């Protein structure tokens, strides 16, 4: 020891933990320590030396600065047990397990905490559990932490049998609450509910940590009543308990109960809310679309002595973005001192979803460290605007691409009608050895369905089977749609019947497929199956049903379904439903009923409604209604040739040639041209598009021969 006078009131000892100031401080094979560390070692006094050195070792280790931590440790002439443990932990935190073992072996004296620290280090670094258990067995005097640490290792590795065995071997005085809580939490995380309940019920002492874990567990099991019963029986609750119960209500769909409990938590005031509680509240307000409550809680935050940290800011901004209040979202973003990729992406995603693409792109260009999410969001944004070239440009600029970005690009082509390009990009994706996911297959199956390309669809189906995702519901629904649109309802129904739990989309797709392929009776039969399943039909279901009634001419049944929409299912019929009914009545010759139905529509009839009436009026030679329908169509679609052509044809049929010429002259004077009909045919795996009267195709003779064969087959049906 070196004594140094400090004042005339006394002396203190300076701990001799460093070498001479003018010498180079080196640590075995390490670089010389920094001047900052040298200064620290020289100014440490005897009363605080070991404690401060231990703290500095831990601090440097957390920051990844092992060199400084080692320097302090090696230059300490006196070390406590905590010093050795701090150095073991420092190496373990930075993945240097061989060095940790070296320090452990060098320890002059090993106590229980030394063994516990080494076992903890091994578990954190996922070392051999067998060796960890051997070390555990070598502990002369095990304590509660020893047992809990080893049980933690078994639980994290999913070795619950060994965890249970060790728990049973744990002395009763060491079980509660540390070891019990470790096993309880492990079972809850693994979803082993019955085992968790057994451990909890077997605990002699149930303190706040174990009870809070069990409240959370009951909520995850869906046993909200049990969770609340335990919550109410607790004599002590912490913020974790309150937050778990509130979140449990929200996840079970009980917003009012969760919000009410939050208010009670605030009123009682014994436990203060924290960032996690508020994040749960903001998420619930977002998911339940409760802007008013969310903004009220935001107001509370500004009055709370609570740090507006990154986590809280992101939660609040996500709520505003998802609810569409972009002004508030931008305001929160503006006041956030720190921002991460979640912050930037949350605002960009919100702007994209609200079609504010220019503003989203401006923010995207400012974003530091753009990631997959931000790139993909912008591709989706420009896809929604129909700017496919910009999507391709962004895709090319991406430093890295994964299956999500490839899928976004393929979906962009599909949603904008570029089906062949979508398939081309899908094959490029496969060539790049990027593995498609279920969303990729749903998109490309949609493309093949739109092209009615059964051969390509079959190949994609085969790849789906090979990749073992044929049981994915979205893929199954896409396969049903593809086969239906390719005219193969038999295979479509085979896929449908293999769906273990079909949803309303599954039923709608199959019913619609039967309907537009002319199998109206099968569509109606499938609807009966839907009703028996207990699932609720929606507007799309009834559109397919009414279309089926049109194909089979079931007027009375069509009326029944149409009226039941409102009376039985509280679904308000839309313009498309009215158009189907007008078509059904018109084809059956009930044109006055069709006209009366249009006059009772609660919404403005669209072109589909008037088009159905015009077509039926021509068929049944009702000039008065045809003229009315044509007039309305011209008002809605002034550039469409359809009303002029159909009305002129009707005049020609009934011998009103002057009116026929008059209508066609009006059409010519307005320079309205009828778009030629377009068709496509697949020959030898290649799609050939052509217009009516088009003779520019190289395979004209082969196309003509194929069309004749199709016509002959149709005549045999």
Curated annotation (Swiss-Prot):
<dbReference type="GO" id="GO:0009451">
    <property type="term" value="P:RNA modification"/>
</dbReference>
<dbReference type="InterPro" id="IPR046848">
    <property type="entry name" value="E_motif"/>
</dbReference>
<feature type="region of interest" description="Type E(+) motif">
    <location>
        <begin position="685"/>
        <end position="715"/>
    </location>
</feature>
<feature type="repeat" description="PPR 16">
    <location>
        <begin position="538"/>
        <end position="568"/>
    </location>
</feature>
<dbReference type="InterPro" id="IPR002885">
    <property type="entry name" value="Pentatricopeptide_rpt"/>
</dbReference>
<feature type="repeat" description="PPR 4">
    <location>
        <begin position="143"/>
        <end position="173"/>
    </location>
</feature>
<keyword id="KW-0496">Mitochondrion</keyword>
<protein>
    <recommendedName>
        <fullName>Pentatricopeptide repeat-containing protein At1g53600, mitochondrial</fullName>
    </recommendedName>
</protein>
<feature type="transit peptide" description="Mitochondrion">
    <location>
        <begin position="1"/>
        <end position="47"/>
    </location>
</feature>
<feature type="repeat" description="PPR 13">
    <location>
        <begin position="437"/>
        <end position="471"/>
    </location>
</feature>
<dbReference type="Pfam" id="PF20431">
    <property type="entry name" value="E_motif"/>
</dbReference>
<feature type="repeat" description="PPR 2">
    <location>
        <begin position="80"/>
        <end position="110"/>
    </location>
</feature>
<dbReference type="InterPro" id="IPR011990">
    <property type="entry name" value="TPR-like_helical_dom_sf"/>
</dbReference>
<feature type="repeat" description="PPR 8">
    <location>
        <begin position="274"/>
        <end position="308"/>
    </location>
</feature>
<keyword id="KW-0677">Repeat</keyword>
<feature type="repeat" description="PPR 17">
    <location>
        <begin position="574"/>
        <end position="604"/>
    </location>
</feature>
<feature type="repeat" description="PPR 3">
    <location>
        <begin position="111"/>
        <end position="142"/>
    </location>
</feature>
<dbReference type="InterPro" id="IPR046960">
    <property type="entry name" value="PPR_At4g14850-like_plant"/>
</dbReference>
<keyword id="KW-0809">Transit peptide</keyword>
<feature type="repeat" description="PPR 15">
    <location>
        <begin position="503"/>
        <end position="537"/>
    </location>
</feature>
<feature type="region of interest" description="Type E motif">
    <location>
        <begin position="609"/>
        <end position="684"/>
    </location>
</feature>
<feature type="repeat" description="PPR 12">
    <location>
        <begin position="402"/>
        <end position="436"/>
    </location>
</feature>
<feature type="repeat" description="PPR 14">
    <location>
        <begin position="472"/>
        <end position="502"/>
    </location>
</feature>
<feature type="repeat" description="PPR 6">
    <location>
        <begin position="207"/>
        <end position="241"/>
    </location>
</feature>
<dbReference type="Pfam" id="PF12854">
    <property type="entry name" value="PPR_1"/>
</dbReference>
<feature type="repeat" description="PPR 7">
    <location>
        <begin position="242"/>
        <end position="272"/>
    </location>
</feature>
<dbReference type="GO" id="GO:0005739">
    <property type="term" value="C:mitochondrion"/>
</dbReference>
<feature type="repeat" description="PPR 10">
    <location>
        <begin position="340"/>
        <end position="374"/>
    </location>
</feature>
<comment type="similarity">
    <text>Belongs to the PPR family. PCMP-E subfamily.</text>
</comment>
<dbReference type="Pfam" id="PF13041">
    <property type="entry name" value="PPR_2"/>
</dbReference>
<dbReference type="GO" id="GO:0003723">
    <property type="term" value="F:RNA binding"/>
</dbReference>
<feature type="repeat" description="PPR 5">
    <location>
        <begin position="176"/>
        <end position="206"/>
    </location>
</feature>
<feature type="repeat" description="PPR 11">
    <location>
        <begin position="375"/>
        <end position="401"/>
    </location>
</feature>
<dbReference type="Pfam" id="PF01535">
    <property type="entry name" value="PPR"/>
</dbReference>
<feature type="repeat" description="PPR 1">
    <location>
        <begin position="49"/>
        <end position="79"/>
    </location>
</feature>
<feature type="repeat" description="PPR 9">
    <location>
        <begin position="309"/>
        <end position="339"/>
    </location>
</feature>
